[in-house]
């Protein structure tokens, strides 16, 4: 593997993979004088390399990763699948979100089981370029998925395929008993043991699920931010005479108070004699009034305040007698 510190490709002037970049993203060392020797041996032992979102344009300089099982190259600017034959042990390859236009140079990866080529620029499928060992394949976001009979063609060409574009190939899923009886080869990058088929698939499905949840959470956050930018209800113009929401002060409806109060309360002269007692008797004393006067007092005009002077004169005459 080239030991140059620069990530610039000598031919195209693009960004390529270097020892320095791999070390920066995937290794940590104590500061001592034997760093170079330790780095050489540790690179050879790496099983997982993450180089996503580094602006990489070219795949190269992977010869020193002899034990590599998983390679993450998503979110770069890679245009061509190349220079992977030097890592035949590779089982997990993510090239999502690049600028790849065709599937090629994958037949030298006989152990490859997971391949993510989603969100690229692939228009035409060359099914004979896919390794027969594939269990999970993701081509979503490419125009090649729109061709007639796409799913049937892919599943027919890949007899071991169990999941295509996030949808299981139902007829090929094996039972849970067979899963439990499978071997326990270990892949630390996926946090648990898995076999070359079903167990590996389970761990990869969990990895995909975490990516989906992250995308959903990002979409929800963007939606909430857009909602916060919408005008509130109180910012909208109100109809005439309608109070603002949340305003319970009396001054909020002055027009209604001025128009309706004179109509609801009538003067004693304008109302009929039978309605005077109801308008003048307070609610707190109404029950005692009915107890003293009985039913006749409800309609008798003598109960009005206007009759009070005559009652005073009668009392004065009795006192003189």
UniProtKB/Swiss-Prot annotation:
LRR repeats: 45-66, 67-88, 89-110, 111-132
Coiled coil stretches, renumbered: 201-221
Keywords, in A-Z order: Cell projection, Cilium, Coiled coil, Differentiation, Flagellum, Leucine-rich repeat, Phosphoprotein, Repeat, Spermatogenesis
Lineage top rank: taxon: Eukaryota
Pfam families: LRR_8 (PF13855)
Subcellular location: Cell projection, Cilium, Flagellum
Residue numbers bearing the Phosphoserine modification: 175, 182
InterPro entries, sorted: Cilia_flagella_integrity, Leu-rich_rpt, Leu-rich_rpt_typical-subtyp, LRR_dom_sf
Segments of this protein annotated with the region Disordered: 235-321
Keyword Cell inner membrane in record: no
GO biological process, one term: sperm axoneme assembly
Gene3D superfamilies noted in UniProt: Ribonuclease Inhibitor
GO cellular component: sperm midpiece
Domain LRRCT residue range list: 142-184
Residues annotated as transmembrane: none
Function: Required for normal spermatogenesis and male fertility. Plays an important role in sperm flagellum biogenesis.
Protein name in UniProt: Leucine-rich repeat-containing protein 46
Gene encoding the protein: LRRC46
